[in-house]
Regions:
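Non-catalytic signal-transmission and effector/linker regions of two-component phosphorelay proteins
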Residues: 1-3
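Proline-aspartate-enriched helix->loop->beta-strand connector
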Residues: 47-52
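Receiver (REC) domain active-site loop signature in two-component systems and cognate sites
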Residues: 57
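Helix N-cap/capping motif at the beta->alpha junctions
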Residues: 32-41
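Two-component/phosphorelay signaling modules centered on CheY-like receiver
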Residues: 11-30
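Active-site residues of response regulator receiver
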Residues: 8, 54
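Conserved beta-strand positions in the Rossmann-like core of class I SAM-dependent methyltransferases
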Residues: 5, 30-31
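Conserved phosphotransfer cores of two-component systems
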Residues: 42-46
Length: 58
């Protein structure tokens, strides 16, 4: 199972990524974050295999 962290400041974009990933039973969504600081904490805590990161957050 692959652990994933999703980091995006737009709730709609985050929920869309979650919706797509939930269709794959081999993927575990370890954390959803709305800013970079939360994202770094989640990455350190969960050690994900994949990170979905919005590269332009306000």
């Amino acid at each position: 199972m692959s652990k994933v962290v999703i980091i995006d400041d737009e709730p709609l974009a985050r929920s869309l990524v979650v919706e797509y990933l939930q269709q794959h039973p081999s993927i575990e969504i370890a954390a959803e974050c709305n800013d970079g600081f939360q994202g770094v904490k989640a990455i350190m805590q969960h050690k994900p295999d994949l990170i979905f990161l919005d590269i332009q957050m306000l």
